[in-house]
Amino acid sequence: MTNADPHELQKFSDLAHKWWDPNAEFKPLHDLNPVRLSWIDAHAHLPGKRVVDIGCGGGILSESMASLGAQVKGIDLATEALGVADLHSLESGVSVDYEAIAAEALAAREPGAYDVVTCMEMLEHVPSPANIVAACATLVKPGGWVFFSTLNRNLKSYLLAVIGAEYIAQMLPKGTHDYARFIRPSELARFVREAGLQMVEIKGIAYHPLAKRFALSNDTDVNYLVACRRGA
């Protein structure tokens, strides 16, 4: 049974044609991308590394990592989004290998094949995030890096990420997030530990509405990033 929610896949497929419009529904991802890219690169030193981007969608992060000199594979089960990613890669001249395959299936096929695994803004959209974390741990080489980002589950995150971002500021389409699937850092830490990974750093992501920009923060109450390593 595939670890995917058909409703979630359809939701992102319906918006596929807007992935690369920096002023449309995916504007927050475009604004966030430089922050997460520089954070990932600071840890993993991307040039020359073999990377798999799980839940890559339209390829915003995948392409930016490839632009830094990484050899990137992007996987997703939203085939319309992958089609957009493929087309944009051809237009930009930035080479990324895209494939419609589940993380668990790729892990079974290519265990220990990647220096870096990224799984950003994806765990809160699947029925079993622990299985995705385990697949990431299988995919990464000993000594390699695994990066996650997701949303904390508390009243503040509900008010800011759901009510604020989707209904008041309208930064995101209504229904983008299901609060019940948000993941507390302690829960993600348990998934990471059970998968045999070591958590190296956790950082929050703050949004500054007046400047309309994202920045790293020590506040993990809403959006947060986690860097992990597999033992050598």
Swiss-Prot record:
Keywords: Methyltransferase, S-adenosyl-L-methionine, Transferase, Ubiquinone biosynthesis. SUPFAM superfamilies: S-adenosyl-L-methionine-dependent methyltransferases. InterPro entries: SAM-dependent_MTases_sf (IPR029063), UbiG_MeTrfase (IPR010233). Its EC number is 2.1.1.222, 2.1.1.64. It is an enzyme of class 2 (transferase). Pathway: Cofactor biosynthesis; ubiquinone biosynthesis. CDD domains: AdoMet_MTases. It catalyses: a 3-demethylubiquinol + S-adenosyl-L-methionine = a ubiquinol + S-adenosyl-L-homocysteine + H(+); a 3-(all-trans-polyprenyl)benzene-1,2-diol + S-adenosyl-L-methionine = a 2-methoxy-6-(all-trans-polyprenyl)phenol + S-adenosyl-L-homocysteine + H(+). The keyword Transferase applies. One of its GO terms (molecular function) is 3-demethylubiquinol 3-O-methyltransferase activity. S-adenosyl-L-methionine binds at R36, G55, D76, M120. One of its GO terms (biological process) is methylation. Belongs to the methyltransferase superfamily. UbiG/COQ3 family. O-methyltransferase that catalyzes the 2 O-methylation steps in the ubiquinone biosynthetic pathway. This is Ubiquinone biosynthesis O-methyltransferase. The gene is ubiG.
